[in-house]
């Protein structure tokens, strides 16, 4: 389970690029299994980047612990650590931005787990462990049947003549 609980919420008013609708948000007691996370660290002037002294999701120490978990004898170069931290920050920023757009599309001023979950499932083919996807049905492209292929071949053949 993650540190935010099963259904974390983030108020979109803390993001400068997302302008929430003036709709009122429901009181916290009315939403089952929800907790408010609060504002995300980072200022609009820094491009939303988190400075090392703020609460980063992935720090150098956490990255080193992860590497030791995979191979206790492995040591990353400083440049590699910086690059991996940058990639992680960029990934998180892009996911949060897309999830905020989904929340705005729902006409909500609150970012919910289902927004992040939908983006990760559709764009990255990732599932968040511990979160059910009853509300989000799997998105699968329809496979083409043999009959359809034959019809399309016939259409192509007749249009070439």
UniProtKB/Swiss-Prot annotation:
Phosphoserine-modified residues are where? Answer: 51
Keywords attached to this Swiss-Prot or TrEMBL record, sorted alphabetically, are:
Isopeptide bond, Nucleus, Phosphoprotein, Transcription, Transcription regulation, Ubl conjugation
**Superkingdom to which the source organism belongs:** Eukaryota
The UniProt record lists the Glycyl lysine isopeptide (Lys-Gly) (interchain with G-Cter in SUMO2) crosslink at: 19
Q: Which residues form the Histone-fold domain?
A: 56-128
**Matching Pfam families:** TFIID_20kDa
Q: Name one GO cellular component term.
A: SAGA complex
Region of interest: Disordered: 1-56
Tell me which residues bear Phosphothreonine.
43, 59
Cell compartments where the protein resides: Nucleus
> Which InterPro entries does this chain map to?
Histone-fold (IPR009072), TAF12 (IPR037794), TFIID_TAF12_dom (IPR003228)
Which Gene Ontology BP terms does the record give? mRNA transcription by RNA polymerase II; positive regulation of DNA-templated transcription; positive regulation of transcription initiation by RNA polymerase II; regulation of DNA repair; regulation of DNA-templated transcription; regulation of RNA splicing; regulation of transcription by RNA polymerase II; RNA polymerase II preinitiation complex assembly
Oligomeric state and interaction partners are given as: Component of the TFIID basal transcription factor complex, composed of TATA-box-binding protein TBP, and a number of TBP-associated factors (TAFs), including TAF1, TAF2, TAF3, TAF4, TAF5, TAF6, TAF7, TAF8, TAF9, TAF10, TAF11, TAF12 and TAF13. Component of the TATA-binding protein-free TAF complex (TFTC), the PCAF histone acetylase complex and the STAGA transcription coactivator-HAT complex. Component of the PCAF complex, at least composed of TADA2L/ADA2, TADA3L/ADA3, TAF5L/PAF65-beta, SUPT3H, TAF6L, TAF9, TAF10, TAF12 and TRRAP.
Role of this protein: The TFIID basal transcription factor complex plays a major role in the initiation of RNA polymerase II (Pol II)-dependent transcription. TFIID recognizes and binds promoters with or without a TATA box via its subunit TBP, a TATA-box-binding protein, and promotes assembly of the pre-initiation complex (PIC). The TFIID complex consists of TBP and TBP-associated factors (TAFs), including TAF1, TAF2, TAF3, TAF4, TAF5, TAF6, TAF7, TAF8, TAF9, TAF10, TAF11, TAF12 and TAF13.
Q: Which family does it belong to?
A: Belongs to the TAF12 family.
Write the protein's name: Transcription initiation factor TFIID subunit 12
The taxonomic lineage of its organism, from the top, reads: Eukaryota, Metazoa, Chordata, Craniata, Vertebrata
